[in-house]
Curated annotation (Swiss-Prot):
It comes from Prochlorococcus marinus (strain MIT 9303). Residues 32-61 are annotated as: NMP. HAMAP family: Adenylate_kinase_Adk. This is Adenylate kinase. GO terms for molecular function: adenylate kinase activity; ATP binding.
Length: 182
């Protein structure tokens, strides 16, 4: 099975759930950029302090800072890994790739979890978060598609993209992902 992976997909597609399952089953390091940022901030590392200052101003953490945090995690990693939540844009991907080449850890596969909007909206509303109403969700999906479509094409052109239908049980989706990575 391929060992250096990216997960892409719209909000509600099950990326986090499937990433956790796959990482546990195959001893891959799960790199969720949101979790990594929170861990760096909590540990009060120099990168974490820089991120905290930006976040406390209500601003987005720069691509460069996220890349530095990802590099920090990968530079001593000899096993496999799964990046979840980064890159989200073509600009981020083109910044990430030279770093991975330098570390001699190129991406081996990109899993795109696809799901129709009706199911996505239903899943997200059922989570019960206060900001998950249909209008907000539709906007998030539109932003996702606008930002991520070029990224999907980029990885398709590189021959890395594996598309998995993310409708069904957690188990059946996990099996489909595993098959796509062999």
């Amino acid at each position: 099975m391929k060992q250096r992976l990216l997960f892409l997909g719209p909000p509600g597609a099950g990326k986090g759930t499937q990433a956790e399952r796959l990482c546990a089953a195959h001893e891959l390091m799960h790199l969720s950029t949101g979790d990594l940022l929170r861990a760096e901030v909590g540990a009060k590392t120099p990168l974490g302090q820089e991120a905290a200052a930006v976040m406390n101003r209500g601003e987005l953490v720069s691509d460069e800072l996220v890349l530095a945090i990802v590099e920090n995690q990968l530079k001593n990693q000899s096993g496999g890994w799964l990046l979840d939540g980064f890159p989200r844009t073509l600009i981020q991907a083109t910044a990430l790739e030279p770093l991975l080449e330098e570390l001699k850890q190129p991406i081996e596969a990109v899993v795109l979890l696809e799901l129709n909007d009706a199911v996505l909206i239903e899943r997200l509303i059922s989570r019960g978060r206060s900001d998950d109403n249909e209008s907000v969700i539709r906007n998030r999906l539109e932003v996702y598609r606008e930002k991520t479509a070029p990224l999907i094409d980029h990885y398709r052109q590189q021959g890395l993209l594996q598309t998995v239908e993310a409708q069904g049980s957690i188990e059946s989706i996990a099996i489909s992902i595993e098959k796509s990575l062999c």
